[in-house]
Regions:
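Residue-level hotspots at or immediately adjacent to binding/recognition sites across diverse folds
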Residues: 1-164
Length: 164
C-alpha cells in the first residue's frame, strides 16, 4: 500500500492496482511473464519480485513498471523494506539488497539455507527459512549474523514468514 494505492501481484507477471480502497482494480503491465511472488512499498517505490530472478519497480503508484538490475536467476521469494533499504531473499539462500529505491540489487550473502521470509522492525532485518534458519542484520542488510538457533526443543522447525 503506497500513496493510497493497493498493488497485488500473481502468476504470469500479473499486476493489478487499486486507488479506491480495493473497490475497483486496473491492470498494469509488468513486462514479464513469470510468476511474481511478492511486492513491497517504501520511499514512494513499489518493488515486486518473483521467478527467474525477476525484479520490477514502479515509482508512479504501480501504473508503470521497469526492470531492476537482478543479480540472480532463481526464484526471489519475498522483498521487504526498512531504513531506505529493500532486502529480498532467494530460493537457494541468497540475500539481496538495494539502497537506490530498488533500481539495483546486489548479492550480500548466501547463508546456505533456503530462505522464504524477510521482515523489518526496530532497525533490524530478519530473514527466515524452512529449515530453522533465522538470520539478522542490524546495519540495513550490509552484514548478517550467522544462523541463530530458534529450535530450543531439538525438533525440525519450519519458518516461512516473519513480521514486526
Amino acid at each position: 500500500f503506497g500513496d493510497n494505492t493497493f498493488v497485488a501481484v500473481g502468476v504470469s507477471g500479473k499486476i493489478v492496482r487499486s486507488t479506491d480502497n480495493g473497490e475497483t482494480w486496473d491492470n498494469a503491465s509488468s513486462g514479464i511473464t513469470t510468476t511474481i511472488r511478492d511486492v513491497s512499498f517504501g520511499d514512494n517505490t513499489f518493488v515486486a519480485v518473483g521467478y527467474s530472478g525477476n525484479i520490477v519497480r514502479s515509482t508512479d503508484n504501480g501504473e508503470t513498471w521497469d526492470n531492476a538490475t537482478d543479480p540472480v536467476s532463481g526464484t526471489i521469494w519475498v522483498v521487504g523494506f526498512g531504513n531506505n533499504t529493500f532486502v529480498a531473499v532467494v530460493h537457494g539462500g541468497w540475500i539481496l539488497r538495494s539502497t537506490d529505491n530498488g533500481s539495483n540489487f546486489s548479492k550480500v550473502v548466501k547463508p546456505g539455507n533456503h530462505l522464504t521470509g524477510v521482515g523489518f522492525g526496530k532497525n533490524t532485518f530478519v530473514a527466515v527459512g524452512p529449515y530453522g534458519g533465522l538470520y539478522r542484520s542490524t546495519d540495513n542488510g550490509k552484514t548478517w549474523d550467522s544462523g541463530i538457533s530458534v529450535n530450543p526443543f531439538g525438533t525440525s522447525e519450519r519458518f516461512d514468514s516473519v513480521a514486526f
